[in-house]
């Protein structure tokens, strides 16, 4: 299968054919993680509703939770106004981060919220 041509024509990819994917938790709106996708990963994600990403380090596609069981069921996919980022609204099972935390954005606060 191939990504719907109407969707593919709206995507802006980097030199490697990749674009940013943000996984956001359904219900809370919490940002869980950021990863890379290509057209194949987005097509697979949309067909299966299982979040599929591109690993730059391994040079291959991976389905979130395929080995760990920490899956992301995708409820919706949105394209941002520039066409270079997709937002996945997901139901997360287990931790989203490879470190074992719920989100990849809970460990290192660079600027604390104002009081």
Swiss-Prot record:
Q: Which cofactors are required for activity?
A: Mg(2+); Zn(2+)
Which Enzyme Commission number(s) are listed?
A: 3.5.4.19
Q: Name one GO cellular component term.
A: cytoplasm
* Chain positions recorded as Mg(2+) binding sites: 80, 82, 84
Q: Primary place of residence?
A: cytoplasm
In Pfam terms, one family for this protein is PRA-CH
Q: Keyword Magnesium on this protein?
A: yes
Q: How would you classify this enzyme at the top EC level? A: hydrolase
Q: Where in the cell is it found?
A: Cytoplasm
Catalytic activity entry: 1-(5-phospho-beta-D-ribosyl)-5'-AMP + H2O = 1-(5-phospho-beta-D-ribosyl)-5-[(5-phospho-beta-D-ribosylamino)methylideneamino]imidazole-4-carboxamide
The UniProt keyword set, sorted, is: Amino-acid biosynthesis, Cytoplasm, Histidine biosynthesis, Hydrolase, Magnesium, Metal-binding, Zinc
UniProt-recorded Gene Ontology molecular function terms: magnesium ion binding; phosphoribosyl-AMP cyclohydrolase activity; zinc ion binding
Gene Ontology process terms (BP): L-histidine biosynthetic process
Kindly state what the record says about how the cofactor is bound: Binds 1 Mg(2+) ion per subunit. Binds 1 zinc ion per subunit.
Q: In which pathway does it act?
A: Amino-acid biosynthesis; L-histidine biosynthesis; L-histidine from 5-phospho-alpha-D-ribose 1-diphosphate: step 3/9
Q: What residues does Zn(2+) bind to?
A: 81, 97, 104
* Cited InterPro entries: PRA-CH (IPR026660), PRib_AMP_CycHydrolase_dom (IPR002496), PRib_AMP_CycHydrolase_sf (IPR038019)
Oligomeric state and interaction partners are given as: Homodimer.
Give the family, as the similarity comment puts it. Belongs to the PRA-CH family.
The role this protein plays is: Catalyzes the hydrolysis of the adenine ring of phosphoribosyl-AMP.
NCBIfam families given in the database record: PRK00051.1
Q: What is this protein called?
A: Phosphoribosyl-AMP cyclohydrolase
């Amino acid at each position: 299968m191939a990504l719907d041509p109407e969707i593919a024509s709206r995507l802006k990819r980097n030199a490697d054919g990749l674009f940013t994917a943000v996984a956001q938790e359904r219900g809370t709106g919490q940002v869980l993680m950021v990863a890379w996708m290509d057209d194949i990963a987005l097509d697979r994600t949309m067909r299966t509703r299982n979040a599929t990403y591109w690993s730059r380090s391994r040079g291959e596609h991976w389905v979130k939770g395929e080995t760990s069981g920490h899956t992301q069921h995708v409820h919706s996919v949105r394209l941002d106004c520039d066409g270079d980022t997709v937002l996945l609204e997901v139901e997360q099972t287990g931790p989203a981060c490879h470190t074992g935390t719920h989100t990849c954005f809970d460990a290192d606060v660079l600027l604390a919220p104002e009081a």
